[in-house]
A protein has these predicted regions:
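Short, flexible micro-motifs
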Residues: 10-15, 24, 100-101, 125, ...
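Electropositive phosphate-/nucleotide-binding environments in soluble metabolic enzymes
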Residues: 8, 12, 16, 39, ...
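Hydrophobic residues at beta-strand termini and immediately following loops
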Residues: 55, 117, 152
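NAD(P)+-binding Rossmann beta1-loop-alpha1 motif at the extreme N-terminus of oxidoreductases
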Residues: 2-56, 60, 64, 145
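Short acidic capping loops at alpha-helix termini that bridge into adjacent secondary structure
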Residues: 29-31, 89, 190
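Rossmann-like NAD(P)(H) cofactor-binding subdomain of soluble oxidoreductases
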Residues: 39, 49, 58-132, 136
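Internal alpha-helical scaffold of NAD(P)-dependent oxidoreductase catalytic cores
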Residues: 103-113, 128-162, 166-191
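Alpha-helical scaffold segments in soluble metabolic enzymes
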Residues: 13, 17, 21-22, 44, ...
């Protein structure tokens, strides 16, 4: 993808991890719009990264972005997507685990390109697999700069990836805690 604006609907841990990965990568992004919902995380991200703008609301984020990343819980997604006005032909990348493509299309109600993705916390250090469904050349290129894209052709198969990814976040959290503990005990992080 060329120089574009992207927006993150939802400002939690996965959004933070993806944004960290973006700034460590060679991705050329003009501006990143983030939703104001979690003010604390939004302000921390804006302080760290100059190209971030905290949107006044979710609609402004959608209006300003070429790509919109849906990084909200399934409950929130179901509630807010119907109220938002997406642009025709906008690219939507959904991290919402339990909303399939048909449900997302129905909630969005516009002709947009939707790709589901499963980023995990190591994306912040540009590591790990990122399953996407359905395959999409631009989304694959984007995520290949943040890890290793795994294209899933069949959405039914993607359910297995969603299930296992739910177990990976706590696993990586435990590894991080253990690594931090070793550093406190005098071992260099590079070891």
């Amino acid at each position: 993808p060329g120089l574009m604006n992207i927006g993150f609907l939802g400002t939690g841990r996965i959004t933070s991890s993806v944004i960290e990965g973006i700034f460590k990568s060679k991705l050329k992004i003009k501006k990143i719009y983030i939703s104001p919902r979690n003010r604390l995380i939004a302000k921390k991200l804006k302080k760290r990264f100059k190209r971030i703008t905290i949107s006044k609301d979710n609609q402004q984020l959608i209006d300003k972005s070429n790509w919109v990343f849906l990084a909200v819980t399934p409950k929130v997604g179901d509630k807010i997507l119907k109220k938002l006005n997406f642009k025709k032909n906008q690219k939507i990348v959904s991290f919402i685990s339990t909303m399939n493509l048909a449900q997302l299309k129905k909630a969005i109600g516009k002709k947009v390109k939707i790709v589901r993705a499963i980023p995990l916390p190591p994306i912040s250090i540009r590591k790990g697999p990122i399953p996407i469904c359905p395959p999409d050349k631009q989304v694959k290129s984007f995520f290949n700069k943040l890890g290793t894209t795994v294209e899933i052709k069949n959405e039914k198969s993607s359910i297995n990836f969603w299930a296992t990814s739910g177990m990976m976040a706590p696993f990586y959290e435990i590894l991080k805690v253990l690594a931090d503990w070793l550093v406190k005990k005098g071992i260099k992080r590079s070891e």
